Amino acid sequence: MADNELFDDPEKLKRGLVKVLECVATISSAAAVVNPIFGVAGSLIRVVLHHVDDEDLQKLKREFGSVNRALDEISQQNRQALLQIRKETVDRQYHEVEENIRHQFRKFMEIMEAKPEHLQRKKEDFVESFINDKDDQNMYTLYDGVMGKRKLFSQPILDVYMKHSQGDHRVMENLCTRLAYLFCIGFIALMGYYGILGDDLESRNEEWEENMRNVQEKMQEVLRSCK
């Protein structure tokens, strides 16, 4: 693969990142934010696997960092709104999954920000940390919790919040935005992990595209039933 093919189209990638931010901030059905992330993640993985230290790559890293910080700020704002409702059992079970996904993504960003001479070590650190943070099980657990499959979570996340908020649309919209954000950053870190290990990214991408369609339908169904 030639160096200039790594980005496919840097401007298109940049627009994709901006689109993610816009969707998180404005879309009424927050799950729709998940859709643009797949193309963005694929481009980022190629950049990480075939590191090129040039001006365009550095600019791309800075722009992605800015988008991530803005997404995180939105997520934190939603967290404050959701703290009005206490659901101790679900929140306690869900907290570890959320923290693991956030940590996995932070370690992935360290690869993006690494100097060429440190890149290999950062990749190794990322893989080790990813495994220590329960590998790919966080995303599957989050998916099962949203879809209502009873494994780690004693009750489906969306059902519990619906009950305790009495179907408040704003609360549920905030929750869906927060969950969509976690799926976005979790997917990027997950694909980075699979990519570094040499896994079949195409089949993994297809699997999670289907999963995210299911999540989107579930969230839209819940939001339609709100007051």
From Swiss-Prot:
Deletion phenotype: Morpholino knockdown of the protein has no visible phenotype. Morpholino knockdown in animals homozygous for the c14 allele suppresses the c14 phenotype.
Q: Which UniProt keywords apply?
A: Membrane, Transmembrane, Transmembrane helix
Q: Which segments cross the bilayer?
A: 179-196
Subcellular localization = Membrane
Q: What is its main location?
A: membrane
Q: Which residues form a coiled coil?
A: none
Q: What is the lineage of its organism?
A: Eukaryota, Metazoa, Chordata, Craniata, Vertebrata
> In the UniProt record, what gene is named as encoding this protein?
rpz
Please report the name of this protein according to its UniProt entry: Protein rapunzel
Please give the GO cellular component terms listed in this UniProt entry: membrane
Superkingdom: Eukaryota
From the UniProt record, give one GO term of the biological process aspect: fin development
**Which membrane topology term applies here?**
Single-pass membrane protein
